[in-house]
Curated annotation (Swiss-Prot):
GO cellular component, one term: perinuclear region of cytoplasm
Domain called GB1/RHD3-type G: residue spans: 35-276
Residue positions bearing lipid (S-geranylgeranyl cysteine): C586
Name of the protein described by the UniProt record: Guanylate-binding protein 2
GO biological process: activation of innate immune response; adhesion of symbiont to host; cellular response to interferon-beta; cellular response to lipopolysaccharide; cellular response to type II interferon; cytolysis in another organism; defense response to bacterium; defense response to Gram-positive bacterium
Amino acid sequence: MASEIHMSEPMCLIENTEAQLVINQEALRILSAITQPVVVVAIVGLYRTGKSYLMNKLAGKRTGFSLGSTVQSHTKGIWMWCVPHPKKAGQTLVLLDTEGLEDVEKGDNQNDCWIFALAVLLSSTFIYNSIGTINQQAMDQLHYVTELTDLIKSKSSPDQSGVDDSANFVGFFPTFVWTLRDFSLELEVNGKPVTSDEYLEHSLTLKKGADKKTKSFNEPRLCIRKFFPKRKCFIFDRPAQRKQLSKLETLREEELCGEFVEQVAEFTSYILSYSSVKTLCGGIIVNGPRLKSLVQTYVGAISNGSLPCMESAVLTLAQIENSAAVQKAITHYEEQMNQKIQMPTETLQELLDLHRPIESEAIEVFLKNSFKDVDQKFQTELGNLLVAKRDAFIKKNMDVSSARCSDLLEDIFGPLEEEVKLGTFSKPGGYYLFLQMRQELEKKYNQAPGKGLQAEAMLKNYFDSKADVVETLLQTDQSLTEAAKEVEEERTKAEAAEAANRELEKKQKEFELMMQQKEKSYQEHVKKLTEKMKDEQKQLLAEQENIIAAKLREQEKFLKEGFENESKKLIREIDTLKQNKSSGKCTIL
């Protein structure tokens, strides 16, 4: 995180006010300044279940997120606390604390669903906090997970394979952590001791049957198992005596239950050690500005009455970042060219030799800062802009050369022009005297350094502009016969034609040079794009293999438990994923 950004306390990120979700612009400004990858940990749960206490522990603070000491819940909307990651240098820990679900004071709990969905969408680790054991009441209270299919879309249009849109959730949903507070029972299943993770998995076991009651029992369990392949569970004893709970944040560790202290330490160690950086499809690492864009896109969709869509969010982010990547690349090109070029160059080749490596650097800058460049729209834009910038430097180089040559011609030939005006050459033999002086001055001009690639063209233009003067001196020189004058005229024409041919040949060579440069530039673009596409494809295949592996594990569990229908559904999803994998398609984009 930028050194000047230090959040000493949490700040509201998304305010839930009058049934409206409103983004806090100051919080967005803070996110904009965080250039590091972000690890986003969000917590949700019923009101007054101690969510904020755990988040303060993750921040390494005694206070911060409001705990409240009465039945009245404190946190409204989603609050954010960005702190340097205590265990991973170069990363920022973004903690998201949410308002209590099903708060009786709110009356209208419509936004509870959106708060839950946003916490899932924005986080890399999603913590669900509840009191007591995982029983049917706890599952019923977690009904929000069953509503995610109605609240979130992975794609903007239906999948042509016919697979349900929610099948893609596993590709971008966070790790699911269930924290059980005031857990007073022994961790046992069928009389045998189990770990907290095993307890969670046992609690997610389905019941056989097709009646309404069984379906209601199975639905939340199915959703958790299908949407969240990475699951973890932590249990916590009651932290202190009931009378002391109202001042929990002020209690010293020795005043707390010893087992609770150990359990909190285990929880914080796991979350801080294993929570991953927030990533998007294709391995796109999320930093502060990218998280800001996701917040704006998702809340904007909700405010407009539509569903937050992962595909739309990624493409919106790509549009913003790819446009910025083009500007970064062009800025790099201009800065480097301005620093390294010494105008005027003596040849076009000299300028192009400078241009090529800097153009290559600019392409690298773009590729490093871009992603999801559908149909190479932005790389094409970059290519066109680089051509325009190159041509602008070529023109400027020629203009500088022309201006320098013009000044030099005026300095060198100015005295000769004055002599012509004074009539110095308007006498017998004056013509040859004029030619002799002009040749000497021409030699002086040609020997002058730093004229650039317009030197010959400017000299030719200058001589052409004085052709009438030369013709007048020739015709008025009484010492020359008519025959001599004709010979001199032919010689002058021949010299002019030779100069014109040289200029034509030069332009032809420059044209060929530009065509060669165009081909080299095109090949450079293709090479770098191919390399990036290979890297992206490799990342995509790795992601899809992980998703397939997760679904296979769950499918095998369903089959082992005797739920053939659920097993077959997952097999269809896996087959579709394998087809997408072979065709190189992202599960989301």
